[in-house]
Amino acid sequence: MNEVVIPKKATKHQFPYEELVLKEDGESHPIWVNYDGLIILETFRESSRQASDFLIAIAEPMSRPLQIHEFQITAYSLYAAVSVGLTTSDIIETLDRFSKNFLPRSVRVFITECTLSYGKVKLVMKESSFFLETANESVYKMLSSDAVIRSHTIGKSKEGGGLSIEVEEVELVKKRCIEIDYPLIEEYDFRNDKVLRSLQIDLKPTTIIRSYQEICLNKMFGNGRARSGIIVLPCGSGKTIVGITAISTIKKNCLVLCTSAVSVEQWKQQTLQFTNMAPDGVGRFTSDHKEWPKDDSGIVITTYTMLAYTGKRSHEAQKIMDLIRRTEWGLLVLDEVHVVPAMMFRRVLSLVSHHCKLGLTATLVREDDKIEDLNFLIGPKLYEADWQDLSAKGHIARVSCIEVWCGMTGDFYREYLSQPTRRRRLLSIMNPTKFQVCEYLINKHESRGDKIIVFSDSVYALKAYALKLGKPFIYGPTGQTERMRILKQFQTNPVINTIFLSKVGDTSIDLPEATCLIQISSHFGSRRQEAQRLGRILRAKRRNDPDFKVYFYSLVSKDTDEMFYSSKRQQFLIDQGYTFTILTDIPEVHENEHCVYKTKGQQRELLAGVLLASEKELESEESEDSEGIVYSTTKLKSLSGGDEMAYIERKAPQGRTLAKGSKKSRKWNPRP
């Protein structure tokens, strides 16, 4: 599939002789607006709070440190603004009111071009079929004459005035409409839907909706209709409750997609906890559970993998899958929606008939640049919260982010310099100093009463650390029953205060007891993974205690590739206003005579084990939402398949001469 064509952005080239002109009272205003739609917000100005709320609605937050926030107006952000009710004049007039300088003409023109076309074309589902509808005759003629759209339609709707689209081609049609500057409106008139049976579901009186969650839902619902789109909230701030509230508002059949079976269990548990939904009205579709709601109407919770699987299924699983395909869903909730652009998962959207989509995520970033595809796969971004603002109000925990540099021992570093890339990576993770620092931090925080999660992408290192330090661990092959048992023990048993997790713990695991996180290895420079892991401790129960902080440690071996990737990983969190403290050394670690791998003999034994590890053991665990991006450092001979080959230059034997007159003895003599 071709890459989506990103709509144009505002540029100065349209009006090359225009200058930025400061208003007379500009000093008191909170924002600067540049030619290209870049907006700088000064958070220390009196009206900065109102300006920030407005900018979140019309622009993409790029960076939000303490004093200065940076936003970018894009075509997609303007589509989202219009989708929640803002008009062209609303956007231009409000932007001008907050701006220190007069709005550049390039920005005015760009806003006008992007917003006037929005809303003229709707995507509607009727009886499990999709239709493009418009009340504008000229727009209808333009759509029906477009070669790409025409090739994916199957005629007019029965009522006329609309084009019928093949279900499998909806994604391509939505993409094409964005390219021609006619983004589709996807709204569901659920109050007037008499075809789908209404669910008996309401929030319990004890369920409390926070102010920012209410803002999210107001962006999604308006005039009795539900808009398709994406809501971005920090980890631990209650994305699941937002989804559950949306379900209880629409009150129609709902399909919830998660990234793991553990997440499925948590969605079901919280649905029953926060609503009055009957237990037999919530079904699970996982490898262990094949359930369907009573009376054929209710909520089904499953994983992306279960729906995307193309192999042969068991009879029971195939039966549930057929029911999912045949059912007309009022709402499709996509948890951790950033995984959807992966080719394996995006086909899920065409498998099920649905009126409305709600995407939930904390990190709207990917390393493969496919995040833009969500604008036509799901819909516009409806709301994105400010992490630091929620932290200041006590909705998520205050965090101390610390990067600890761990010096490599001589033997380990000598091998590190000479080994192939994958084994070098394991050597930097198994660094004895990192082992000792990890042990020290665990002991320190356990003595303070903290609950600790240690993350490792390397399964070899995960097992080695956990077994050496005597802690339970969870990774891919760990059975569902064993996973739930370990997590339950971690939450309730005062003796089990530390657990080790592989990539399977990156997302959708709710552990409000955790107050400290230690990262010993990671997925190269993935910004998303860094933020997702931080989210495991943002929901700490004790977050409102006076002066309480949670701790996020990233252990990095000095003078290795880990230092380069660490700086890349931190960029998303820095853009959210977090700062990292760097510890170049912890003296207490060296003073402990009883720490692990203290002697040279123990370190050499550890090194021997790493060098003898098989190629299979060197692999990192693949997560279910892998982005398909692989980072590696290698040599040209590896790329060309010459790892097992060597170039040797042999000198010709000395003292031998060719016979006179031999053809091989002839020399070339250039003409003078």
UniProtKB/Swiss-Prot annotation:
Keywords: ATP-binding, DNA damage, DNA repair, DNA-binding, Helicase, Hydrolase, Isomerase, Nucleotide-binding, Nucleus, Transcription, Transcription regulation. Pfam families: ERCC3_RAD25_C, Helicase_C_3, ResIII. Its EC number is 5.6.2.4. Residues 436-594 form the Helicase C-terminal domain. A motif (DEAH box) lies at residues 335-338. Residues 650-672 are annotated as: Disordered. Residues 220-382 form the Helicase ATP-binding domain. ATP binds at L233, P234, C235, G236, S237, G238, K239, T240. It is found in: Nucleus. CDD domains: DEXHc_XPB (cd18029), SF2_C_XPB (cd18789). It comes from the Eukaryota. InterPro entries: ATP-dep_DNA_Helicase (IPR050615), ERCC3_RAD25_C (IPR032438), Helicase/UvrB_N (IPR006935), Helicase_ATP-bd (IPR014001), Helicase_C-like (IPR001650), P-loop_NTPase (IPR027417), XPB/Ssl2 (IPR001161), XPB/Ssl2_N (IPR032830). One of its GO terms (molecular function) is 3'-5' DNA helicase activity. The keyword DNA damage applies. Residues 661-672 have a biased composition (Basic residues). GO terms for biological process: nucleotide-excision repair; transcription initiation at RNA polymerase II promoter. One of its GO terms (cellular component) is nucleotide-excision repair factor 3 complex. It catalyses: Couples ATP hydrolysis with the unwinding of duplex DNA by translocating in the 3'-5' direction; ATP + H2O = ADP + phosphate + H(+). Belongs to the helicase family. RAD25/XPB subfamily. Component of the 7-subunit TFIIH core complex composed of XPB/SSL2, XPD/RAD3, SSL1, TFB1, TFB2, TFB4 and TFB5, which is active in NER. The core complex associates with the 3-subunit CTD-kinase module TFIIK composed of CCL1, KIN28 and TFB3 to form the 10-subunit holoenzyme (holo-TFIIH) active in transcription. ATP-dependent 3'-5' DNA helicase/translocase; binds dsDNA rather than ssDNA, unzipping it in a translocase rather than classical helicase activity. Component of the general transcription and DNA repair factor IIH (TFIIH) core complex. When complexed to CDK-activating kinase (CAK), involved in RNA transcription by RNA polymerase II. Also involved in transcription-coupled nucleotide excision repair (NER) of damaged DNA. In NER, TFIIH acts by opening DNA around the lesion to allow the excision of the damaged oligonucleotide and its replacement by a new DNA fragment. This is General transcription and DNA repair factor IIH helicase/translocase subunit XPB. It comes from Encephalitozoon cuniculi (strain GB-M1) (Microsporidian parasite).
